[in-house]
Swiss-Prot record:
<dbReference type="GO" id="GO:0090729">
    <property type="term" value="F:toxin activity"/>
</dbReference>
<protein>
    <recommendedName>
        <fullName>Phallacidin proprotein</fullName>
    </recommendedName>
</protein>
<feature type="cross-link" description="2'-cysteinyl-6'-hydroxytryptophan sulfoxide (Trp-Cys)">
    <location>
        <begin position="3"/>
        <end position="7"/>
    </location>
</feature>
<feature type="propeptide">
    <location>
        <begin position="9"/>
        <end position="23"/>
    </location>
</feature>
<comment type="similarity">
    <text>Belongs to the MSDIN fungal toxin family.</text>
</comment>
<comment type="function">
    <text>Major toxin that belongs to the bicyclic heptapeptides called phallotoxins. Although structurally related to amatoxins, phallotoxins have a different mode of action, which is the stabilization of F-actin. Phallotoxins are poisonous when administered parenterally, but not orally because of poor absorption.</text>
</comment>
<feature type="cross-link" description="Cyclopeptide (Ala-Pro)">
    <location>
        <begin position="2"/>
        <end position="8"/>
    </location>
</feature>
<keyword id="KW-0800">Toxin</keyword>
<feature type="propeptide">
    <location>
        <position position="1"/>
    </location>
</feature>
<keyword id="KW-0883">Thioether bond</keyword>
<dbReference type="InterPro" id="IPR027582">
    <property type="entry name" value="Amanitin/phalloidin"/>
</dbReference>
Amino acid sequence: PAWLVDCPCVGDDISRLLTRGEK
């Protein structure tokens, strides 16, 4: 999503959550 690209720091955290299968 664009909002992830807009905030790399948050996107990195989201990536970790995605890897864990959180959200």
